[in-house]
Amino acid sequence: MISKKLSLILLAVVFVIEGVSLFWIRGDYRSTMLDGAEYEVPASIDFKGDFYGRNYLPIYIPLTEAPWKGTATPEKGEEIYLSFDKNGEGLLEITGASDRKPGGMYIITRVVSASDGLVHFRFPADRMYMLPEQLKKLSVVELSERVQLKDKSGKKTETRMKNDLTALIHIKDGRVVISKVLANGSPVEQTYTTVGKNLSVKYA
């Protein structure tokens, strides 16, 4: 009888802890979305798995390594701080990583691996939440289409994504959330046609 009561108490404690954690996570998400500084980053959409059976759009942001500017080489799983700036195209780029909190804006993430003066990590935002009915309207064919283009020399042909995808992110106190995904500068939820850019292309 005592064991059963103890089990129920422990179960209740677990539910309370999970509820409090979820409350804080949602609070951080809302705070970052509303008050965070906005930046644009390169992005791609992950169409694998049950794409339409979710309430979010899975996003890959290819910012995954930086020069290590900290003290000792970090261990896998260690929390680190990323410094960043805007490149010539106005997109956010990671300029360094450290175990010490930098002045100004920064991003918090964890180490995947480190070697030869570089640290590798996962970008700490990988989804944009959407209503299921919005998600079902997205044109997978349009957003995943690839085309063949001549390079700058005009001698070689390269296969690239037809649409130029980027994401708008908000950053606050090291936390990051994705607010929008853009296809050629327009929100993906408004991209339902196969017009794309005005380019001379050959379909791959």
Regions of interest found by a model, annotated:
Residues 1-3:
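N-terminal hydrophobic targeting signals that begin at the initiator methionine
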Residues 5-24:
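Hydrophobic membrane-insertion alpha-helices, especially the h-region
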Residues 28-44:
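Alpha-helical transmembrane signal-anchor/signal-peptide segments
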Residues 36-38, 56-58, 77-79, 162-164:
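Extracytoplasmic
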Residues 41-70:
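Short extracytoplasmic
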Residues 45, 55, 63, 86-88, ...:
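A mature extracytoplasmic/lumenal domain signature
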Residues 70-90, 98-100:
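Short, compositionally biased
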Residues 83-85, 92-97, 108-204:
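Extracytoplasmic/periplasmic terminal helices and flexible tails
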